[in-house]
Regions:
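PLP-dependent enzyme catalytic core of the Aspartate aminotransferase-like
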Residues: 11, 175, 243, 354, ...
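N-terminal small-domain helix-loop-helix segment of the aminotransferase-like
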Residues: 14-107, 114, 302-304, 411
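Helix C-cap/helix->beta junction micro-motif
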Residues: 143, 212-213, 243, 368
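Conserved core of the PLP fold type I
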Residues: 72-208, 225-226, 233-238
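Conserved core segment of the aminotransferase class I/II
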Residues: 241-318, 325, 408
Length: 411
């Protein structure tokens, strides 16, 4: 029944997510560094977090219209730009940030690095919650700040969770490792790689803990518009006044609309003194000025047409997730995909295969000829996992899973 229903949905979709896009000649990262990263340029890449779907035409049309003008001098931010973004956030997440709280940043990882340099001295510390997006560790370390680890607790699959394994925050351990040198906590919300939409109670508790201790929470919310299966994203700064006053939120349309190469990120800082300190630094270094195409792409995305595309894309993503879960259950039951609540990234629990780290990587890379992110790069708790990007046409996923099935059964 599920297959029939999904086929029916595909037939009535306006947009074609089954279309194969040839990315050769575009210098795309997903294919371009396979030899350097994996030692094989001919792998099927399902690793870096951009989509293999065509960027929607209403965005490319807006960019072409500006290109037709043929003069690309200095530009200013379009009128009502921040009002437009604030309205989108309010419509989707029931929280409206004030326009004066917002500014452009040249990428979220860059924004994290900038915030670290502004607010954390070199002898101070940054807390992260592994397994988590690896730049949360690399960026503080690269800026000569000590990283403090507050590992998430795995919560096994239960009926109460709809059969979904997940993670929870360990507040007891957080209290143990947090000392007076801890100045910042980097939060992944929704969580990457496990796709968790953190609930308001958890975020409120985290906000209270950090606010009491003068810790700034940097909340990476880049996957916020990709909540799945009826789940909802909760902006960290929305859960309490304490959360608002101790937080820096980063967001962008790049994941949702597949425009990562057009850097359209933004920051939201409700606290007046924090905002003055951070935004003055950004302005002094001219890091709050977007390139000419960023506002154009964002304004084209955050429209009723963009909302229609987003909803269809999420339907397709949900179908891909169901397909991966069903395929593994029926063909490779030792691999247990965690059903994400948000994003197009699926956390594959491969521990039942009984392989060590190198054997697991070799199974995917050398035998199945697939490029995924291995779990160890996400830190403690990621051992035995692989991160799969399922934002691809169904035929591509089928090919990948068939390769994996054949490789495992012929091990």
């Amino acid at each position: 029944m599920r297959t029939f229903q999904w086929e029916l949905v595909i037939k009535i979709m306006k947009y074609d997510f089954d279309k194969i896009i040839d990315r050769s000649g575009t210098d795309d990262l997903k294919h371009g560094v396979l030899q350097q990263r994996y030692g094989d340029a001919n792998l099927l890449p399902l690793w870096v977090a951009d989509m293999d779907f065509e960027t929607p035409q209403f965005i490319t049309d807006a960019l072409r219209k500006r290109l037709d003008h043929s003069l690309f001098g200095y530009t200013m931010m379009p009128e009502n730009y921040w009002k437009h973004i604030a309205q989108w956030i309010e419509e989707h997440h029931q929280w409206r940030p004030r326009e004066e709280w917002m500014t452009y940043i040249p990428g979220i990882v860059k924004g994290i690095g900038m915030a670290i340099n502004v607010f954390v001295k070199e002898d101070e510390k940054v807390i992260i919650q592994p397994p988590v997006y690896h730049p949360f560790r690399l960026t503080p370390q690269g800026n000569h700040r000590q990283v403090v680890y507050n590992p998430l607790i795995e919560t096994p699959s239960t009926e109460g969770q709809g059969g979904r394994a997940s993670y929870s925050m360990d507040f007891d351990q957080l209290a143990e490792v947090c000392d007076s040198k801890c100045r910042m906590l980097i939060l992944s919300n929704p969580h990457n790689p496990a796709g968790i939409c953190w609930d308001a109670d958890t975020l409120r508790r985290l906000a209270h803990f950090c606010h009491e201790r003068g810790i700034i929470v940097v909340s990476d919310e880049i996957h916020c518009d990709m909540a799945l299966f009826g789940n909802r994203h909760t902006p960290f700064a929305s859960v309490s006044e304490e959360a608002a006053q101790c937080s820096i939120t980063f967001g962008a349309p790049s994941k949702t609309f597949n425009i990562a190469g057009i850097v359209s990120s933004y920051a939201i800082v409700p606290n007046d003194s924090m905002r003055r300190r951070f935004y003055t630094w950004l302005e002094a270094n001219e890091l709050n000025e977007p390139h000419i195409f960023s506002p154009i792409a964002t304004l084209a995305a955050f429209t009723p047409e963009g909302e229609e595309w987003r909803k269809e894309m999420l339907q397709y993503i949900e179908g891909n997730i169901n397909y991966v879960i069903d395929y593994c259950r029926n063909n490779i039951p030792q691999i247990k995909p965690w059903r994400p609540q948000a994003s197009f990234l699926v956390w594959l629990d491969c521990r039942a295969l009984g392989l060590n780290h190198q054997q697991l990587v070799d199974l995917f890379v050398k035998q199945a000829h697939l490029a995924l992110n291995d779990g160890e790069m996400f830190g403690k708790g990621g051992e035995g996992f692989m991160r799969l990007n399922i934002a691809a046409p169904r035929n591509v996923l089928t090919e990948a899973l068939e390769r994996l099935r054949w490789s495992w059964h012929h091990e």
